[in-house]
Amino acid sequence: MARVVGSDPETDLAVLKVNLTGLPAITFTQSDKANVGDIVLAIGDPFGVGQTVTMGIISALGRTHLGINTFENFIQTDAAINPGNSGGPLVDANGNMIGINSAIYTRTGGSQGIGFAIPVSLVVQVMDQIIKHGSVIRGWMGVEVQDMTPELAESFKLKDTNGALIAGILKGGPADRAGIRPGDILVSVNDKNITDSSGLLNLIAMLVPGQTAQIKLLRNDKAMLAAVKVDTRPRIQQPLTDQ
């Protein structure tokens, strides 16, 4: 009998506890050392036919803007992933887990050679927090952001599309209290450069609530600094039952 310890709707991950002893455990590898072209195996129960292993390669790393989860940093693979594979491990050629199979891109309902897995580095972060706190605690600044398109970059007289445009500010929120305004372009958080809006959200989420983050931004063609006291990201409630 498995008991739900906690879940994280924003990454579509959950931690289960099984009250049995002597069970074998999979070993983790470091997903940040994975390379495009590495051989991987996807394990699951596609369409309920029974445990199945499919082989492929890593097609891409750091996939974002897929609209699957709030926080995205997917491994893309061409290993056949079908309904029933979600939640199963993606392992390297040595059998070490590199990710958890999450979703596929398909127009037919079956595999088309474009599957996505949550990297084990993110899995471990979420797992550790759920075991410790029962949920995932993330940083939050109260901003609505969007990517810098080539058109926006041109209108702001920028040389490239790096950074994230502040489209909205929550009144009274951390960013508002720090003086950040709609129309500002955030370019770094604690000296970590921002490439796009997804990268900014991921950086903010990793901040510890209560700490002060140093933000570099552009306003009216001028570089500015802002100190933002990070708050706790509001939780999304998604009840789970024991299975």
Task: Show where each model-derived region lies.
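Serine-dependent protease modules
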Residues: 1-162, 167-171, 176-178, 197-212, ...
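Short beta-strands and strand-loop turn motifs
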Residues: 41, 186-187
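Conserved catalytic motifs of ABC-family nucleotide-binding domains
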Residues: 183
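Short strand-turn-strand beta-turns centered on an Asx-Gly dipeptide
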Residues: 189-194, 220
